């Protein structure tokens, strides 16, 4: 496969000598410009090699190699604070800040995180994983610095996608008001913003980056304002300058917001980047925005040609994740397509996740009814609420981890008004290698506690399609939570049907022990039943597809004729399925009549690691569930209520 790298990728995956000599950012200051360019090539080689093996975010990291080098030459990390928005483009930063020898462990269990992490290195002053946080965090650090009368620089690096988030503009507005010394680097990779990059802009940037220009400007202001009528002359001159810039230059918006604007800068030209950074560093009483133009996937032909595809790749593959059958996201997309074909009132809304959420074909066929609002989850929910008031049925499609950002809007703008908004919660449960910031382990809890919200988790592809159909027809706020990865391989029924709200399903009838599992955990409970059958144990298995409202009648009936009751979920224990069933049993006075165990994710932030490894570690796979069942049945001398969280 042709990569477009200037140096061929070594098959033995050993980094060549120059990169191997970089143990800290200070080592970069010894290199010549030619050596820095060579280093950039070697960094890209290592990124392609490692991410191809381990998986991760490739295109974004390839696009900021020169910026990373320039930042660490101009500034003194960790004294100076470099904050990477989202953090998925920080791989080169990790290589240059003392983590080169650990880089082989990237996104591996117990290894380096795929994002910035405060626990990992002092060079990561702020952890990330979600977008649009860097400017707020950086401004907070800069203000804290000034209050403490300390002296260091704070630099926030944010992409043109993340800057579309409302939180970014809140921070920009605040920063301009405070007039704090602070640098924001806008990494514009051409996927959202199209600024002027012509000869005039380049000429003016060459002037702006020259410290002599700033000195001359200040001197001219002092000279003119000291003359008779000088202040009026200076004001007139500035007004002419502003009018010219507004008509010709892309930075006028930022200057109106209180920032000094520098750019556009060639983000792959180390010399030009260093000049811009040094210039920005010298401004004392105003925030500076450096507008940098980069190529996402730079240096790797496949990634440059399809930056969306190579935004994130699977382990041991240079392309998209592979597997058998359809993923839950694909089944969702196909079902929604069918529903939208039949019902013109159904619309889809997503927050910069059209491809990841399986909406590409839907968007292609219904371009007027699919809305990608950018990285704006709060807006997405209230936008949906507004459409719902006018008779439309919005389906909001968001990853579980990002839905957390719109919690107030779900309560205030949807549920309080009982609006029929459907929440399609993708990547629910254990997500895997992206780690703590991306695990979808809180959604069952925070969605179930909201009054009037229906919360469901399908056990397979059939459940998913029927529950989506039910959600669209319910006329109520409705949450549909499904996992990352491929389905169970079941054959889907051709006709969609409503599943009565609150009605759960007995999949297998047994004796003594009952397992209430929800979502993906149903498949693992089935595996556990096969293991238990070898010991002559035949449990009752319930597909607990409705978490709110619960099927109280079924729970009480089964609790009344079984000795043991197990709940299984890929969600934290607090507020999840097990917690809610415990409450029902307590209110019915059955806590002492049946022995209970809740198998769930611990109430903690779950580390990165592949899904199978993490499920095994926390006892959520078939083997783990079977072991807990056997342990519960054997442990008759213990308290009747056990919360089983891990092996």
UniProtKB/Swiss-Prot annotation:
What EC number(s) are associated with this protein in UniProt?
2.2.1.7
Task: State its cofactor.
Answer: Mg(2+); thiamine diphosphate
Q: Which SUPFAM superfamilies match?
A: Thiamin diphosphate-binding fold (THDP-binding) (SSF52518), TK C-terminal domain-like (SSF52922)
What is this protein's name?
A: 1-deoxy-D-xylulose-5-phosphate synthase
Q: Which family is it part of? A: Belongs to the transketolase family. DXPS subfamily.
Any transmembrane segments, and where? Answer: none
SMART domains from the UniProt entry: Transket_pyr (SM00861)
GO CC term (a single one): cytosol
Metabolic or biological pathway: Metabolic intermediate biosynthesis; 1-deoxy-D-xylulose 5-phosphate biosynthesis; 1-deoxy-D-xylulose 5-phosphate from D-glyceraldehyde 3-phosphate and pyruvate: step 1/1
- InterPro entries listed in its UniProt record: Dxylulose-5-P_synthase, THDP-binding, Transketo_C/PFOR_II, Transketolase-like_Pyr-bd, Transketolase_C, Transketolase_CS
Keyword Amino-acid biosynthesis (UniProt): no
- Molecular function terms from GO: 1-deoxy-D-xylulose-5-phosphate synthase activity; magnesium ion binding; thiamine pyrophosphate binding
Cofactor note as given:
Binds 1 Mg(2+) ion per subunit.
Q: Catalysed reaction(s)?
A: D-glyceraldehyde 3-phosphate + pyruvate + H(+) = 1-deoxy-D-xylulose 5-phosphate + CO2
Q: Note the PANTHER family from the entry.
A: 1-D-DEOXYXYLULOSE 5-PHOSPHATE SYNTHASE-RELATED, 1-DEOXY-D-XYLULOSE-5-PHOSPHATE SYNTHASE, CHLOROPLASTIC
- Annotated residues for binding of Mg(2+): 160, 189
Residue positions binding thiamine diphosphate: 88, 129-131, 161-162, 189, 300, 377
Gene Ontology biological process terms in this record: 1-deoxy-D-xylulose 5-phosphate biosynthetic process; isopentenyl diphosphate biosynthetic process, methylerythritol 4-phosphate pathway; terpenoid biosynthetic process; thiamine biosynthetic process
Provide the alphabetized UniProt keywords: Isoprene biosynthesis, Magnesium, Metal-binding, Thiamine biosynthesis, Thiamine pyrophosphate, Transferase
User: What does the annotation say about its assembly with partners?
Assistant: Homodimer.
Q: What is the protein's known function?
A: Catalyzes the acyloin condensation reaction between C atoms 2 and 3 of pyruvate and glyceraldehyde 3-phosphate to yield 1-deoxy-D-xylulose-5-phosphate (DXP).
| Species, as recorded | Dehalococcoides mccartyi (strain ATCC BAA-2266 / KCTC 15142 / 195) (Dehalococcoides ethenogenes (strain 195))
